[in-house]
UniProtKB/Swiss-Prot annotation:
InterPro entries: AAA+_ATPase, ABC_transporter-like_ATP-bd, ABC_transporter-like_CS, ACT-like_dom_sf, MetN_ABC, MetN_ABC_transporter-like, NIL_domain, P-loop_NTPase. One of its GO terms (molecular function) is ABC-type D-methionine transporter activity. ATP binds at G65, R66, S67, G68, A69, G70, K71, S72. It is an enzyme of class 7 (translocase). Residues 1-22 are annotated as: Disordered. Its EC number is 7.4.2.11. This is Methionine import ATP-binding protein MetN. Part of the ABC transporter complex MetNIQ involved in methionine import. Responsible for energy coupling to the transport system. The gene is metN. The complex is composed of two ATP-binding proteins (MetN), two transmembrane proteins (MetI) and a solute-binding protein (MetQ). It comes from Rhodopseudomonas palustris (strain BisB5). PANTHER family: AMINO ACID IMPORT ATP-BINDING PROTEIN, METHIONINE IMPORT ATP-BINDING PROTEIN METN. It catalyses: L-methionine(out) + ATP + H2O = L-methionine(in) + ADP + phosphate + H(+); D-methionine(out) + ATP + H2O = D-methionine(in) + ADP + phosphate + H(+).
Amino acid sequence: MSEPFMNAPWQPPGDHPALKSPQPTGILIDSVRKLYPARKASAEVVALDDISLNVPKGSILGVIGRSGAGKSTLIRLINGLDKPTAGRVVVNDVEITSLDEPALRRARRSIGMVFQHFNLLSSRTAFANVALPLEIAGTPKAEIEKRVLPLLDMVGLADKRDRYPAELSGGQKQRVGIARALATEPAVLLSDEATSALDPETTDQILDLLKQINRDLHLTILFITHEMAVVKALADRVAVIEAGRIVEEGATFDVFATPRHEVTRRFVSSVTGSGAPDWLLAQLQPLQPPGGKAVLRVTFKGSDASQPLLSRVARTLGVDLNILFGQVEMIAGHPFGTLIVSLDASPDVLRQVIAQLSAGNNLVEQLGYVA
């Protein structure tokens, strides 16, 4: 990893629940606020409001939020491009927020950055773009050659070393950007919407590459995104940011399986299809019409997703369960499924059906009725 440097005294994290972790800390964000003062006709802007996060070393945290939620401000504070109004940012045991400019420049060598629009120099080849941070750091030419060639090989561009950005595809440009971010052998990798300018197939390839880098180099990765599909594919943990505050944070599977905040539920629904399809929503009624059927949404988590629960309930209670919609997928290595069913049952039998379907980790919601 990067060379040692003098750093400001670091103190253990405070008492905020988000800061407690049994693992060594890669990134610590402790009670951070960022205010932009009022200017002329513009009022004061609270960009970040009491943000606390603990990213264990070697883990991958996804920070998701809508435009203007505070994601970009957060990443600027982590890499020292801006300072918080209050609170601390600690990266690889170095308190970034208290460093002077020379120490901050040294500290940034332990932080790699991947950008949305690649930020490659058009006049430099792929090799020269990756070599740039090493040249700036004064690394000897022979050492640069030893460092850059394996990185180009790692990202699958060994045969493109002499190509210019104009000769590369979007995915290849981002691979150059990733190799450049790794050139100084950082302990932490930050990613700012690294896949949002790419097509779906290339996005999957870049996410696979980031997972491989995390495994092989044991890097701590923090990425920001507005796409829950990226979180699902890459993150160990996810933090949801809204209006400058963390509204939900936890293991990726837990957040997908049991989203607590309305913003999180909207993000999750966009990926898992756990929301009812439009054609069904158009038919749902809040009150039971004559001859109408109740509509239930059953969310299965973990091992419960592979159990024959519907057939068991149908046999036990003597009811017919009509499947209107369903899917099962893997999230963070765990199965997660959603089924929407309709049934014709008395209120008493309906209560029994809901009780039996709610066994284990399942979540059952009555959505309404259909004619």
